[in-house]
């Protein structure tokens, strides 16, 4: 891998924009490209599901059942990247170039290790995974074909995710956005070609959807590699004489592991919800899967906002600028709540229209319309919790994020859903989301009050 040493002045003698630019335009500058990138990322699964829904409802259900393990894969990639992002930004804020470089190099090494793990999972674990959720052999086989391709060829998604985090950590979110767009456009173009059998029956249906997805991911990965080696002078990456550093990896996962665990908790929640809903019907599972695809268009922009927010907070925390830290948090919460309000209005007032994108049958509409209207009530509270979760991570307190996530999804949402399912009405199950969000926001505010007192306030002295 080539280095960037020939480009511009080294980071030690330059002040990064995260320490000098006014907060509001800086947050928008970093976040808007990341928000677009995250929306584009949401397209990967959504586009697959839209085209697959026109094949059959069983194919849509299969892709929905695959989501839990896919989310684990994303969790590992993004969580590792979160650790790299926060530590790299903090190192640059402290003017510690050698630590910044070591963080980047070890992050890339970890992404390759993650690929190796999921390669093995793709070869060995597909059948037990799907048959644990359904006894329908048609749904299971369609899911196996889809998910095995995604896991075995997961090098693309892990490389792309890490590359994007390196760009975001140094303020180059526009380049991250471009790489996402390239991957998504390739996926969108290839999806109908493969899914509907234009390249042969062997690559049709769910198999074709997976092939189109991984090709798009590899294209995005190629772009991030190019941008980081040619257009990112804040880090100098060289694997000549590289040895994995247990200390650097430990620092990365001190921040990133709670993020991984939080998203894996989300996978356990979706897996559990699938089991609860399958007791009603496969159509209920398909509706839940469609909801998760659709809600990603509401939540992903906030995750993008957080990706822009985290390096600002980490950098200014390292530079001992508490005024900039607190202003960043306040602005991020305001923007997040605005996004959530827009999402609430769409789900509340146009559920039939959004469900129709997935070729929803009358049975799906009967379950899906009330589901969308009930579930979206928790959007009004979720914006604050999501932003504060990333604030905890940026300030090195990711364990608080993990505690909130585990309590919300495993100790409140799933038990509430199971109890409500005992009423015999699937419509009652959806209220579990609002109940869980009330608990989540109360815990998040309590933890933030503690962090403000012990971590942010001392920076004023």
Task: Explain the meaning of each model-derived region.
Residues 20, 24-43, 47, 69-76, ...:
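Residue-level signal for short hydrophobic patches within transmembrane helices
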Residues 81, 150-168, 176-184, 209-224, ...:
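Short runs within selected transmembrane alpha-helices of multi-pass transporters and secretion channels
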Residues 72-75, 119, 187-192, 221-225, ...:
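Hydrophobic transmembrane alpha-helices of multi-pass small-molecule transporters
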Residues 1-31, 88-155, 201-257, 313-378, ...:
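Short alpha-helical transmembrane segments in multi-pass integral membrane proteins
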Residues 122, 165, 191, 195, ...:
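Structural signal for membrane-spanning alpha-helices in multi-pass inner-membrane proteins
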Residues 39, 43-61, 130-137, 193-204, ...:
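Helix-terminus/linker motif at the lipid-water interface of multi-pass membrane proteins
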Residues 60-120, 157-176, 287-351, 382-404:
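Small-residue-rich hydrophobic transmembrane alpha-helices
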Residues 29-48, 149, 160, 183, ...:
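Transmembrane helical elements of multi-pass membrane transporters/channels
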């Amino acid at each position: 891998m080539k280095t960037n040493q020939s480009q511009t002045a080294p980071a030690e003698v330059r002040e990064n924009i995260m320490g000098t630019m006014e907060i509001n335009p800086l947050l928008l500058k970093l976040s808007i490209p990341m928000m677009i990138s995250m929306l584009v990322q949401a397209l990967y699964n959504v586009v697959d599901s839209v085209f697959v829904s026109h094949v059959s409802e069983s194919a849509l259900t299969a892709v929905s059942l695959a989501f839990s393990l896919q989310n684990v894969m994303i969790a590992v990639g993004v969580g590792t990247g979160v650790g790299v992002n926060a530590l790299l930004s903090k190192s640059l804020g402290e003017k510690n170039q050698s630590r910044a470089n070591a963080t980047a190099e070890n992050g890339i090494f970890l992404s390759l290790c993650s690929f190796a793990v999921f390669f093995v999972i793709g070869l060995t674990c597909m059948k037990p995974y799907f048959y644990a959720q359904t006894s329908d052999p048609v749904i299971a086989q369609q899911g196996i074909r889809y998910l095995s391709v995604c896991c075995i060829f997961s090098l693309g998604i892990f490389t792309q995710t890490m590359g994007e985090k390196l760009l975001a950590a140094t303020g180059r979110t526009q380049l991250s956005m471009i790489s996402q767009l390239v991957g998504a456009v390739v996926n969108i173009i290839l999806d109908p070609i493969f899914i509907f059998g234009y390249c042969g029956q062997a690559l049709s249906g769910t198999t074709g959807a997976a092939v189109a997805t991984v090709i798009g991911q590899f294209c995005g990965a190629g772009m991030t590699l190019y941008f980081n080696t040619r257009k990112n002078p804040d880090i100098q990456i060289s694997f000549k004489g590289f040895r994995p550093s247990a200390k650097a990896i430990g620092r990365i996962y001190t921040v990133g592991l709670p993020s991984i665990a939080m998203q894996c908790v989300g996978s356990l929640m979706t897996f559990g919800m699938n089991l609860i809903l399958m007791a009603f019907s496969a159509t209920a599972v398909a509706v839940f899967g469609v909801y998760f695809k659709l809600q990603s268009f509401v939540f992903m922009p906030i995750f993008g906002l957080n990706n822009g927010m985290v390096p600002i907070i980490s950098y200014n925390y390292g530079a001992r600028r508490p005024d900039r830290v607190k202003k960043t948090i306040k602005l991020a919460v305001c923007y997040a709540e605005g996004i959530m309000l827009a999402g609430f209005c769409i789900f509340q007032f146009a559920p039939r229209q959004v469900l129709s994108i997935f070729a929803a049958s009358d049975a799906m509409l009967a379950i899906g319309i009330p589901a969308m209207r009930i579930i979206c009530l928790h959007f009004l509270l979720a914006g604050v919790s999501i932003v504060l979760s990333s604030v905890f991570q940026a300030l090195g307190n990711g364990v608080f994020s993990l505690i909130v996530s585990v309590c919300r999804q495993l100790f409140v949402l799933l038990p509430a859903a199971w109890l409500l399912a005992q009423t015999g009405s699937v419509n009652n199950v959806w209220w579990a989301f609002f109940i869980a969000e009330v608990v989540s926001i109360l815990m998040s505010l309590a933890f933030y009050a503690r962090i403000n007192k012990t971590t942010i306030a001392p920076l004023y002295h």
